[in-house]
């Protein structure tokens, strides 16, 4: 469950290491984002020479959350950290690699490129 001011780890190789959520997209009064939801964020920590630098405003899709999520079959999925992948305007990932597992909900929300790059889909 990601809300404004939440900090997330970046799970790709764009050069950003940590982002801070500015806004959850999908309605004027939407408060929380889960796996597969798009957020607007700012880069809080980045490595030198990366594609993005500190202070950049970016769009990202949430791929892992600590808050458990109930699936239609009754099972629950949760992760050890909150993580996101930076995306372009056309919802393709900005990086060329994805680190760590991602939730199956990304496939339902049509983020197929991220699913194909991920080493594991849970």
Swiss-Prot record:
PROSITE patterns: RIBOSOMAL_L14
GO terms assigned for molecular function: large ribosomal subunit rRNA binding; structural constituent of ribosome
BP terms from Gene Ontology: translation
InterPro entries named among the record's database cross-references: Ribosomal_uL14, Ribosomal_uL14_bac-type, Ribosomal_uL14_CS, Ribosomal_uL14_sf
Keywords, sorted A to Z: Ribonucleoprotein, Ribosomal protein, RNA-binding, rRNA-binding
The keyword Ribosomal protein is annotated on this UniProt entry: yes
UniProt GO cellular component terms: cytosolic large ribosomal subunit
Role played: Binds to 23S rRNA. Forms part of two intersubunit bridges in the 70S ribosome.
Assembly notes: Part of the 50S ribosomal subunit. Forms a cluster with proteins L3 and L19. In the 70S ribosome, L14 and L19 interact and together make contacts with the 16S rRNA in bridges B5 and B8.
HAMAP family: Ribosomal_uL14
Family the UniProt entry places it in: Belongs to the universal ribosomal protein uL14 family.
The protein, known as: Large ribosomal subunit protein uL14
Native organism: Nocardia farcinica (strain IFM 10152)
Taxonomic placement: Bacteria, Bacillati, Actinomycetota, Actinomycetes, Mycobacteriales
């Amino acid at each position: 469950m990601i809300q404004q001011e939440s900090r997330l780890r970046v799970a790709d190789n764009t050069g950003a290491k940590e982002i801070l959520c500015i806004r959850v997209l999908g309605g004027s009064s939407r408060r929380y984002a889960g796996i597969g939801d798009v957020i607007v964020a700012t880069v809080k920590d980045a490595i030198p020479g990366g594609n993005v630098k500190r202070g950049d405003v970016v769009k990202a899709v949430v791929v892992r959350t600590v808050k458990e999520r109930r699936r239609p079959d009754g099972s629950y999925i949760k992760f050890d950290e909150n993580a996101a992948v930076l995306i372009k305007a056309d919802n393709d990932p900005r990086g060329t690699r994805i680190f760590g597992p991602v939730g199956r909900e990304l496939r339902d929300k049509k983020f197929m490129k991220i699913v194909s790059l991920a080493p594991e889909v849970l």
